[in-house]
């Protein structure tokens, strides 16, 4: 017998402040929104879509359902580099598509999707790392037959690679140079069937007196292994887009060149003629808008079938055009195809008549072609029609970009009543056209929601002989209610269950239903239902004491009585029968569990029983060792619920404790001994654990009655995998479920809903499904203008919008009070002045854009109760930053920082200080006299505000050692500042102890007056550099949530920085990261240290995105990392899991 005490991991987030931690652990919670898409059969099955994130650090793979017109995220792969371009290709004879990609690593890579993961098949270095104007990678074009590709830079460089097969492998040839002194705008691959590959480029020659744009064709001579540059063709300087035209037997070939209000079809010259440019060109009439604006095409997509092809093109206003060619008359025509609400960066047409539209700003869409408009005659002038009459939206893909501001830990209740989840990260982001509300929780898809007469105490479903759920059983204090599942769910009294007593447990065992009550158990044959004959039910009466708890599987039943455990088994060819004797318990049981019967076996060999002495026992029910205690586990509280569940070849015991802690214990499937354990606090109150099926995988639903509901599941996305135990265990994630917490839950399985969950929340019965790949719950509040800044006031969100310029309150997902402003707003804050009342201060620009020189500004004050306007103060420049300061208002106006008090008719200036450049952000540490000032060039300056006889005076105390273009600021603690800059850098700076002590003790500024600024800085002291890290996105807001920092990026990235206090744990994590980087160069071969230290070297931050590779790498590499770190596999995996639990 194995006896052990459960050890709980102590979170690194103890009472020690974040700033004093030994190291920070970085984790990307949400990658940026996609910017480009490719389609193909990447897994060799149905058509799929791959999208590239806006920051280039993630590849998203979606499966496409042609019937519903929707896509489902099935895999996310963090690339640990900046991928610049991706293209799909397929070599002749292959049955699946591959991906070729360029990145900032200076390496071109061929990728394959294999075993639910992207793997790199071949890497070929072509230039220096980083993104440079002369290093190829900005443009990538692949021959339609997959034979060659061209890689080009913005300036001069072009390389051509031949793609080929070497046995089962795909190889890339050495590069062929096609360099010319020019600036490149576009590169596309022409369709020439199986002739020599041809690429078309839009270029401007360098060095000419009056350069203009030119169309140049490059031919790869496969025989001579040489690239031929054809004579250039002059094209309009307004050329904005180019796309290839099908060639060979499918079309005329060549390219379509789009310029302002014009389209020209150019055909490449004869093969082999080095001096031949375009063999001919055809002008195509482009319809003109009635509004009179110019048509500038920026995106297009080609649909090609055996008998036709056409393009969908879009201009900068969102107008769509269908461009087609009559195969008989060879005449081109352009049909206005309606207008979209967004401008797209990428259009992709799928074979199922759906189109993927990735938006430049806002949500992306999946659209279905209702009609091709073949019967409609093209018109020369069109009126804007929105939405398009030819397209319908089948799915909206929620996107955050661009994010201008955010607030965290707020009530994200929206109009669809998807409520917040306690202790779950929630964000409201200010974006174009409204507010985006997101929570880091799974979103349930509600199928049925029906009221109940009163809340039940227990809930089950029971399956019929065909494997579908037949009954829903609800237990009340003195009765049992049975609902029959058919075309509708109705109450029934013919189930055979006893209805005038409460039920402890129900289940389907063999060919019978079992109903457990306090005095015993009823066994009802399934053949009884619907039969005219009344088959007798078997009654088993408890010999002594009462039945307290019970559990059943398809062939086993376990009953926990006051002081004993009884076991029943339904073997093939016999009825349910009790085993002679009982397992004696020293304490009353609180919960029991029996595992599902493994495939090919007649029984599960173990049961688990928890008792009120805070222990759980694993008991054998194998006939050869019946009722032998296999293991005993000590707990920190009584277990209120147990569940045994197999995931793959691993058996887990899931426990919900009375103190709100969820525990998962790994058992040896052969001996039943305890191998390892994992725990996490879910919520106050007794937890229940219920096995369910989500997405075809066995999962566990963890619920704290009325507090929080979570789903433990095998996670399909590599960037959020969490392991459950040893090195051979599958990976398990515990994610919160948004919405009203469930009081009761059970699995639900029918033909129409094979992987559902049924639950009770209050007095409402719900049936729902959960998509475990969608990690965020997302909602939106539409606004007329573009939200620029946010603040949170109690349960209300205040935002300022531009176009129109307004102050808007949002409460419970609905727009409340709206106030017009006197110009484009730039900043907002909540401030309590000396009168003790709360106000909202709004800064703005009076004349046009806030960035325009000479523009005046204003500061408007509104009451917090009803948004009543108090007064407006004119200032000489727009206040780009406002913050509250101990009963006063701090404003950043131009290069000045000013202190204002509330007056009767305007705010009154109390103090000011001149800094070197324009102030962009402010932060104040509550209760202190310190204000952090961020500017556009000189980084951060911390100022102290002292109250002297003459009034308030502002003194610069400490400034940065290097220049940074600050975009956001946050006071972590009294002496530490976190900031983000416009190049994607996250930095933490600390005030030197000498400067901090001086500021605290020099109340009369005797010494502060005498301090002279150092060179290139407004202050005498300089910050100590604490930490720095590159997050790949421009930070726009930094928040503190649950003792860790949350950073939101402009393009939708959400990152977390978690303090790791223990020096030993810090060293271990850094060592693991080092050897993980050494063991795998990644998909693109990017040096990880240089990538995360793009502009400033990484300091005191360990990259959790890289650490997670330990959990998904193959067994051989994991053992190698465990050996080199000296921690072993379980030690390395355990340390990564422990820190991941904190996010």
UniProtKB/Swiss-Prot annotation:
Subcellular location(s) per record: Nucleus
GO-annotated biological processes: mRNA splicing, via spliceosome
Taxonomic source organism: Yarrowia lipolytica (strain CLIB 122 / E 150)
One example GO MF annotation: U2 snRNA binding
Keyword terms of this UniProt record: mRNA processing, mRNA splicing, Nucleus, Spliceosome
Gene3D superfamilies for this protein: YVTN repeat-like/Quinoprotein amine dehydrogenase
Biological role stated in the UniProt entry: Involved in pre-mRNA splicing.
Protein name: Pre-mRNA-splicing factor RSE1
Main subcellular location: nucleus
Subunit comment: Associated with the spliceosome.
SUPFAM superfamilies per record: WD40 repeat-like
Similarity comment: family membership: Belongs to the RSE1 family.
PANTHER family xrefs: DNA REPAIR/RNA PROCESSING CPSF FAMILY
GO cellular component: nucleus; spliceosomal complex; U2 snRNP
């Amino acid at each position: 017998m194995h006896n052990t005490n459960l050890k709980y991991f102590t979170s690194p987030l103890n009472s020690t402040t974040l700033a004093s931690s030994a190291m920070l652990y970085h984790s990307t919670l949400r990658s940026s929104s996609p910017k480009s898409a490719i389609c193909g059969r990447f897994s060799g099955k149905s058509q799929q879509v791959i999208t590239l994130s806006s920051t280039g650090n993630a590849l998203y793979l979606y499966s496409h359902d042609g019937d519903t017109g929707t896509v489902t995220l099935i895999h996310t792969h963090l690339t640990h580099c900046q991928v610049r371009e991706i293209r799909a290709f397929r070599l002749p004879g292959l049955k699946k598509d591959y991906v070729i990609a360029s990145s900032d690593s200076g390496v071109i890579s061929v990728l394959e999707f294999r075993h639910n993961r992207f793997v790199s098949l071949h890497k070929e270095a072509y230039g220096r790392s980083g993104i440079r104007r002369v290093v190829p990678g900005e443009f990538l074009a692949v021959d339609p037959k997959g034979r060659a590709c061209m890689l080009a830079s913005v300036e001069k460089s072009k390389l051509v690679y031949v793609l080929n097969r070497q046995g089962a492998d795909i190889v890339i040839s050495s590069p062929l140079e096609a360099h010319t002194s020019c600036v490149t705008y576009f590169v596309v691959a022409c369709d020439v069937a199986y002739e020599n590959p041809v690429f078309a480029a839009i270029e401007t020659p360098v060095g000419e007196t009056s350069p203009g744009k030119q169309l140049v064709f490059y031919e790869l001579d496969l025989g001579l292994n040489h690239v031929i540059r054809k004579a250039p063709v002059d094209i309009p300087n307004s050329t904005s887009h180019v796309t290839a035209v099908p060639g060979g037997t499918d079309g005329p070939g060549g390219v379509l060149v789009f310029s302002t209000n014009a389209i020209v079809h150019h055909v490449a010259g004869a093969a082999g003629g080095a001096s031949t440019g375009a063999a001919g060109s055809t002008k195509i009439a482009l319809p003109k808008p009635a509004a009179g604006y110019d048509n500038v095409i920026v995106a297009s997509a080609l649909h090609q079938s055996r008998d036709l092809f056409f393009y969908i093109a879009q201009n900068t206003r969102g107008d769509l055009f269908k461009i087609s060619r009559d195969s008989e008359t060879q005449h081109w025509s352009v049909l206005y195809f309606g207008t979209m609400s967004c401008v797209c960066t990428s259009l992709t047409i799928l074979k199922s008549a759906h189109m993927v539209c990735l938006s430049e700003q806002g949500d992306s869409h999946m659209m279905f072609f209702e009609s091709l408009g073949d019967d409609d005659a093209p018109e020369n002038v069109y009126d804007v029609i929105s939405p398009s009459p030819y397209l319908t939206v089948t799915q909206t893909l929620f996107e955050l970009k661009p994010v201008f501001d955010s607030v965290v830990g707020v009530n994200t209740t929206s109009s669809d009543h998807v409520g917040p989840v306690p202790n779950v990260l929630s964000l409201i982001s200010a974006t174009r056209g409204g507010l985006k509300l997101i929570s880091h929780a799974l979103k349930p898809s509600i199928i049925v929601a029906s009221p109940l007469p009163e809340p039940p105490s227990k809930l089950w479903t029971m399956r019929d002989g065909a494997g579908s759920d037949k009954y829903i059983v609800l237990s009340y204090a003195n009765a049992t209610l049975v609902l029959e599942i058919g075309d509708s769910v109705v109450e029934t009294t013919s189930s055979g269950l006893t209805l005038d007593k409460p039920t402890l447990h129900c289940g389907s065992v063999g060919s019978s239903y079992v109903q457990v009550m306090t005095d015993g158990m009823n066994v009802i044959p399934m053949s009884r239902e619907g039969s005219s004959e009344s088959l007798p039910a078997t009654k088993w009466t408890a010999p002594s004491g009462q039945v307290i708890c019970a559990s059943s599987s398809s062939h086993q039943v376990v009953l926990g009585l006051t002081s004993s455990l009884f076991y029943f088994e339904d073997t093939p060819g016999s009825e349910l029968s009790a085993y002679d004797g009982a397992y004696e318990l020293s304490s009353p049981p609180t919960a029991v569990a029996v595992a599902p019967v493994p495939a090919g076996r007649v029984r599960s060999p173990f049961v688990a029983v928890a008792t009120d002495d805070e222990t759980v026992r694993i008991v054998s029910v194998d006939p050869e060792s019946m009722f032998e205690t296999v293991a005993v586990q000590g707990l920190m509280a009584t277990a209120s619920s147990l569940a045994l569940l197999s995931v793959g070849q691993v058996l887990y015991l899931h426990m919900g404790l009375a103190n709100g802690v969820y525990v998962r214990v790994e058992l040896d499937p052969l001996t039943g001994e305890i191998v390892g354990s994992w725990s996490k606090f879910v919520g106050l109150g007794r937890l229940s654990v219920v096995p369910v099926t989500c997405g075809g995988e066995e999962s566990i639903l963890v619920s704290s009655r009325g507090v929080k509901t979570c789903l433990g599941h095998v996670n399909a996305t590599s960037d959020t995998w969490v392991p459950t135990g040893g090195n051979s265990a599958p990976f398990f994630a515990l994610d919160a479920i948004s919405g009203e917490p469930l009081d009761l839950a059970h699995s639900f399985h029918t033909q129409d809903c094979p992987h559902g969950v049924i639950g009770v929340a209050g007095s409402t019965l719900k049936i729902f499904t959960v998509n475990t790949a969608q990690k965020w719950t997302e909602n939106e509040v539409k606004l007329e203008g573009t939200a620029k800044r946010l603040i949170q006031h109690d349960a209300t969100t205040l935002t300022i919008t531009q176009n129109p310029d307004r102050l808007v309150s949002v409460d419970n997902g609905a727009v409340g009070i709206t106030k017009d402003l006197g110009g484009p707003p730039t900043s907002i804050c909540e401030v309590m002045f000396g009168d003790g009342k709360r106000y909202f201060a709004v800064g703005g620009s009076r004349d046009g854009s806030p960035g325009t020189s000479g523009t005046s500004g204003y500061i408007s004050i509104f009451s917090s109760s009803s948004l009543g306007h108090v007064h407006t103060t004119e200032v000489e420049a727009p206040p780009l930053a406002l913050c509250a300061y101990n009963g006063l208002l701090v404003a950043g106006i131009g290069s000045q920082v000013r202190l204002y008090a509330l007056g009767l008719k305007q705010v009154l200036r109390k103090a000011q200080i001149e800094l070197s450049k324009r102030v962009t952000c402010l932060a104040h540490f509550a209760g202190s006299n310190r204000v952090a000032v961020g500017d556009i060039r000189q980084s951060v300056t911390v100022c102290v505000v002292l109250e002297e006889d003459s009034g308030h005076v502002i003194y610069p105390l400490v400034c940065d050692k290097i220049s940074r273009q600050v975009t956001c600021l946050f006071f972590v603690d009294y002496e530490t500042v976190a900031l983000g800059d416009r190049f994607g850098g996250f930095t933490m700076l600390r005030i030197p102890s000498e400067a901090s002590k001086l500021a605290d003790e020099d109340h009369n500024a005797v010494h502060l007056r005498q301090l002279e600024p150092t060179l290139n800085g407004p202050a005498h002291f300089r910050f100590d550099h604490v930490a720095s890290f590159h997050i790949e996105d421009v930070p726009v807001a930094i928040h503190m949530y649950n003792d860790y920092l949350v950073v939101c990026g402009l393009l939708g990235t959400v990152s977390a920085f978690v303090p790791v206090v223990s020096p030993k744990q810090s060293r271990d994590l850094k060592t693991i990261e080092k050897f993980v980087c050494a063991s795998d160069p990644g998909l693109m071969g990017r040096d990880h240290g240089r990538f995360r230290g793009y502009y400033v070297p990484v300091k005191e931050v360990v990259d959790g995105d890289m650490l997670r590779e330990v959990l998904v790498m193959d067994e051989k590499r994991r053992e190698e990392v465990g050996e080199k770190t000296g921690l072993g596999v379980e030690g390395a995996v355990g340390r990564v899991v422990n820190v991941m639990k904190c996010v």
